[in-house]
Amino acid sequence: MKILVDENMPYARELFSRLGEVKAVPGRPIPVEELNHADALMVRSVTKVNESLLSGTPINFVGTATAGTDHVDEAWLKQAGIGFSAAPGCNAIAVVEYVFSALLMLAERDGFSLRDRTIGIVGVGNVGSRLQTRLEALGIRTLLCDPPRAARGDEGDFRTLDELVQEADVLTFHTPLYKDGPYKTLHLADETLIRRLKPGAILINACRGPVVDNAALLARLNAGQPLSVVLDVWEGEPDLNVALLEAVDIGTSHIAGYTLEGKARGTTQVFEAYSAFIGREQHVALETLLPAPEFGRITLHGPLDQPTLKRLAHLVYDVRRDDAPLRKVAGIPGEFDKLRKNYLERREWSSLYVMCDDETAAALLCKLGFNAVHHPAH
C-alpha cells in the first residue's frame, strides 16, 4: 500500500509508515504522476482535491489534515466511492492564540484595555467557541453571530451580524467559506458592512480570504477612516493584494493555525481515520510526538494583568514575527507558499509551564490554556 503525504505535514512519515509505504510530496502543485501509483492521499489546504485531480487514479481515500474543507469536492469523492476525512478543530487553539497575540499587541500599541472593548465573534464553531470561552474568562464582553447555529436552536445568545457591526469594537471572523446557499459567507464582510464599521474598530480575518471583500477593505483604509486590520488570509492566495498588505496593521501568510500542536493534531486525526478505514484502527497520544518546549518553566509573582498576559503570550508567540517576513517578500511569486513551507516552529500556550504565587492568577492562566500551577511563596 502506498500513501502520499503533503511534505508540510509533521509526523506524517512516522505515523503513516506504520500502515504502508509513504512518499512526501509538495502540496501546491501536487505531482500528478505520483497519484497513479498510490492508494491514499493526505493533503493540507493548498491542494485542490476534485475530479480533475483524482479521476482515473487508484486513490481510494483522501485525508485533509485541516479543519476547513473548501479545497475538497466532497460530493464528487462520495460519488466516486473515495473515503474522506478532515481534522475538525485540530488548529482551533492555534487560531485563538493568534487572535489573542494580535489583540494584545494592538492594545499595548494603542493604549487600551481589552476589558473596555466588546468583541464580536462571527462564526461560533471550534475556533469561535474557544475564543469566546477565553475572552469571557478574562471578563471581556463578547457578542456572537452564527445564523446556522441559531436556526438549529443551539444554546447561546446569538445576534444578527447587523447588531455586531453596530455594537462591537472588534469584529473577528471564524466561519467556513460557503460560496452560495442560505448561509453564504463569500464577501460576508462586503462593502456595506466595511463602510459601517465603527471608527477605530478592529477587523480580524483568520478563516478564509474571500469572507472579507479585500477591494472594499482597501477602499475603506485608503479613505483614511480609522480602522485597525489583522489579516491572515487573503483573496486570491497565494497572490495577495500587496497594496492591502501595506495598509493593514498585521498581515501574515495564512499561518494562524500553524502551531506544532495544531499540525500534529491534524496529522493524528487523519491517521486515525485512515487506519480505521482500512480496518487497522490505531490511536496516537499527541504528547508522545511533541518535542520538549523551548522554555522549561517560568515563575510569575502577583496577579495577572493585561501587560503580564501579553508578555506571557508573546513569550510563546508574537504575531509580529510573521508580519515582517511577509512584507519583505510581498508580490514575489512563490514566496507566500515558501513562508508557509519553511515556517518557524511555533508552540501553543499549553507548552509554557508557569509557577504562580497568586492562586487566582494560576486558576485564570489554566482557563486560558497555560500549564499553570499555584506555588505559594515561602
Swiss-Prot record:
Its EC number is 1.1.1.290. Belongs to the D-isomer specific 2-hydroxyacid dehydrogenase family. PdxB subfamily. The active site is at 208, 237, 254 (proton donor). Transmembrane segments: none annotated. GO terms for biological process: 'de novo' pyridoxal 5'-phosphate biosynthetic process; pyridoxine biosynthetic process. Coiled coil: none annotated. Substrate binds at residues 45, 66, 258. GO terms for cellular component: cytosol. Catalyzes the oxidation of erythronate-4-phosphate to 3-hydroxy-2-oxo-4-phosphonooxybutanoate. This is Erythronate-4-phosphate dehydrogenase. InterPro entries: D-isomer_2_OHA_DH_cat_dom, D-isomer_DH_CS, D-isomer_DH_CS1, D-isomer_DH_NAD-bd, Erythronate-4-P_DHase, Erythronate-4-P_DHase_dimer, NAD(P)-bd_dom_sf, PdxB_dimer_sf. Keywords: Cytoplasm, NAD, Oxidoreductase, Pyridoxine biosynthesis. HAMAP family: PdxB. Pathway: Cofactor biosynthesis; pyridoxine 5'-phosphate biosynthesis; pyridoxine 5'-phosphate from D-erythrose 4-phosphate: step 2/5.
